[in-house]
Regions:
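Conserved catalytic or regulatory cores that recognize and/or transform ribose-phosphate-containing ligands
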Residues: 1-175
Length: 175
């Protein structure tokens, strides 16, 4: 009997201080609990990102990018704009864009192979900053929060944005 391979999920977000590392680890544990049928890749847990082994920029880029390309789920912390997270989101968005672009391809065999190698991603952005709900009530320079609209637009173009990580669970249950 052939063993079915689990789909891959990717967890994107800042990884540069103790609080961010703790948050990524918490997210990984929750995602594995909510969707045990998915193999969740969490860069902070990956050997390629172990700074004691002195990985090169290329090692990190390709180690993580290969996982993004193969993932079916892409969950990103958008709260503190991180260049790495934005770049990862761009890769995930581009794969989905290419699927749409080539949707009219007549060659179904090639199409199936592309989908298997680079699956369409369910993209979910988490924008959990506590200032977001009231940001529109302020004026001028007193607006307490802003997000890069290009980054937000890319996520909303092909995904969803939630304001609490707990809301991700409900979206993951939707097919």
């Amino acid at each position: 009997m052939k063993k079915t391979k689990k789909p891959l999920g990717y967890i994107a977000g800042n990884l540069f201080n103790e609080a961010e590392v703790a948050q990524r680890l918490k997210e990984g544990a929750l995602l594995r609990k909510w969707r045990p049928d998915v193999e969740w890749y969490n860069p902070i847990e990956a050997p390629i990102n172990d700074k004691s082994t002195m990985p090169t920029a290329s090692d990190i880029f390709w180690g993580d990018t290969n996982k993004i390309l193969k993932s079916s789920y892409f969950i990103a912390d958008m709260t503190n704009l991180d260049l790495g997270t934005a770049y990862e989101m761009g890769i995930a968005w581009t794969i989905n864009f290419m699927h749409k672009f080539f949707k009219k391809t007549k060659n179904t065999k090639k199409k199936k192979k592309k989908e298997k190698n680079f699956p369409i991603k369910k993209i979910i952005g988490v924008l959990s900053d506590i200032r977001v709900p009231t940001a529109g009530k302020y004026e001028d320079m007193f607006v307490p929060y802003g997000i890069n609209q290009y980054f937000l637009g890319g996520c909303l173009d092909d995904g969803k944005v939630v304001h609490k990580f707990a809301e991700v669970e409900k979206l993951l249950k939707k097919k």
